[in-house]
Amino acid sequence: MKGIDIYSGQGSVDFNAVKESGVEVVYIKATEGLTYTDSTYKDFYDGAKNAGLKIGFYHYLRANDPTSEAEHFFNTISGLSLDCKCAIDVEVTLGQSIDQISSNVRKFADYLINKGLDVCVYTYTNFYKDNLNSTVKDLPLWIAEYGVSKPNIDASYVGFQYSDSGSVNGISGSADLDEFSEGILVGGTVVIDPGQGGDDNIKAIQQDLNILLKRGLEVDGIEGPETEAAIKDFQSIMGLTVDGIWGTNTSGAAQQIFSRPLDGVAYPHYEYATRYIQYRVGASVDGTFGSGTKAKVAAWQSNQGLMADGVVGSATWSKLLDEN
């Protein structure tokens, strides 16, 4: 699908002309940092919506508390109808280390995922290679690289920004030009090419499965039968469609678990985290944290030398994910 991404610097946009030119997807800048809101985001949204274009929003990530930045973005776009994944635009280091940048992206993404939103990461090829680690490479990728027919990256991607100086009917100046797959859409599946060896996305998935299922998969970036079987096992535990594809729902379930939410009878409901806890402690897996699950958690905690309170906090999550 042909796409563009725009912000207030574009000036006025004739969205009907944009659509007639063959564009299907429009990404609109909504926010940046802790407080900045793009002055045209709502006007652009209304215009694109009226023209029948598919709409997504992006946030330009700075070096602040990532949860606060995510909250600012979420509050800004709340109530608006999205066709495409929320994009986290990360492209400057701002004096941060690889781990700091990746942690910020992860926390921003997890905040939105826990709010029920689909997310993707936008960045440049070199930034992706040099400044992001494996903790965020399971997130759908929208990659930018100019002057090439295909980005020079060994990873699956749902979007490719191939120009920042394109010409589009309906926009007076230059525009960013993109090509998107169906994976950019809300609920869209990121299909992994099993013939692509050494894919960083697949390596990240294999690492996640080894942590979650203690499977001992070889982290080789190749989706063979063992990796597919592990994905299916995880999907079954999560109550998802068992198709062996690491799509949005499967990735979202894993991301909720890795966010390590405080979970227990008297705490907010996290279905996927609860299912994982039930699976690990030997409780009936139904996604509801009831008294039976609490008793199983308490017994497991006692066996691990933890305080047996039946509440899954940071110490219990550490045992579940980091040690056992």
Swiss-Prot record:
Sequence repeats: 212-234, 235-254, 255-277, 278-300, 301-324
Superkingdom: Bacteria
Gene Ontology cellular component terms for the protein in this record: cytoplasm; extracellular region
Annotated catalysed reactions: Hydrolysis of (1->4)-beta-linkages between N-acetylmuramic acid and N-acetyl-D-glucosamine residues in a peptidoglycan and between N-acetyl-D-glucosamine residues in chitodextrins
Pfam family, one: PG_binding_1
Protein localization: Secreted; Cytoplasm
Gene Ontology molecular function terms on file: lysozyme activity
Family from the record: Belongs to the glycosyl hydrolase 25 family.
Lineage: Bacteria, Bacillati, Bacillota, Clostridia, Eubacteriales
Name of the protein in its database record: Autolytic lysozyme
Positions of region (5 X 23 AA tandem repeats): 212-324
UniProt record, GO biological process: carbohydrate catabolic process; cell wall macromolecule catabolic process; defense response to bacterium; killing of cells of another organism; peptidoglycan catabolic process
Enzyme class: hydrolase
Active-site residues, as the UniProt record annotates them: D5, E91
E.C. no: 3.2.1.17
Subunit structure, interactors included: Monomer.
